[in-house]
Amino acid sequence: MELKEYLDYLVEFIKETVKKANAKGVVIGISGGIDSAVVACLAKKAFPNDYTAVWMPIESSDEDYKCKQELIDQCGIKAIDVELKETFLSFKKAIKDSTTPEHKLAIANAKARLRMTTLYTVAQTNSYLVLGTDNLDEWHIGYFTKFGDGGVDMVPLVHLLKREVREAARILGVPTSIINRAPTASLWEDQTDESELGITYDQIDAYLAGEINDENVKSRVDHLHKISEHKRNGAVAPKEFKRK
């Protein structure tokens, strides 16, 4: 199947999933990154009059803002702003005041969880479903926040490699500034995905596509997949209670 044909299928997949849930449309959080840009374009195609993109800045960079604005202007994306910085700072202070030791990644992941809460509030208000943005690479290695950006109703890009997401962005007319930008979750200043992961998306793509046999890459990807298994599964339950 050609990628363009698959993108058409994804539009129908989104429509059908919403219909089955007896919902009216979809909501998507946009970040200035390529994955959310692609999903926003698919959302617009699926529900031209019943979708909302939400920009939720929390110490977001100037580059984040510039890229999300280019997406809105160039692709005609309908978006609202929900400023979460003060909410995040209040939360951060409350955790600190509780004498809980500060953990850099845990605090950073709280940003994703605040955004998830925001998206579900917008979704429930409008009878929408929440669209996720994880691609195959991110899903396989668990590069998403549990009950944060991983807390969604559907994941349209979950079978697409990162390079296929880039190609999808070109097909859908996403701004080149977003396509060429270094992938970042914007967890903290100057953070990039690849520097945090210790591996490149090109390497992950190649491994998942069966194109390379590099033991270092295989070991790293397999390790990340194993330790993130809990993110892809539901809550762990004990054995069933047998009533007499």
From Swiss-Prot:
SUPFAM superfamilies: Adenine nucleotide alpha hydrolases-like. It catalyses: deamido-NAD(+) + NH4(+) + ATP = AMP + diphosphate + NAD(+) + H(+). Pathway: Cofactor biosynthesis; NAD(+) biosynthesis; NAD(+) from deamido-NAD(+) (ammonia route): step 1/1. Keywords: ATP-binding, Ligase, Magnesium, Metal-binding, NAD, Nucleotide-binding. Its EC number is 6.3.1.5. Pfam families: NAD_synthase (PF02540). ATP binds at residues 29-36, 133, 162, 184. One of its GO terms (cellular component) is cytoplasm. The keyword Metal-binding applies. InterPro entries: NAD/GMP_synthase (IPR022310), NAD_synthase (IPR003694), NH(3)-dep_NAD(+)_synth (IPR022926), Rossmann-like_a/b/a_fold (IPR014729). One of its GO terms (molecular function) is NAD+ synthase (glutamine-hydrolyzing) activity. Belongs to the NAD synthetase family. Catalyzes the ATP-dependent amidation of deamido-NAD to form NAD. Uses ammonia as a nitrogen source. Homodimer. This is NH(3)-dependent NAD(+) synthetase. It comes from Mesoplasma florum (strain ATCC 33453 / NBRC 100688 / NCTC 11704 / L1). The gene is nadE.
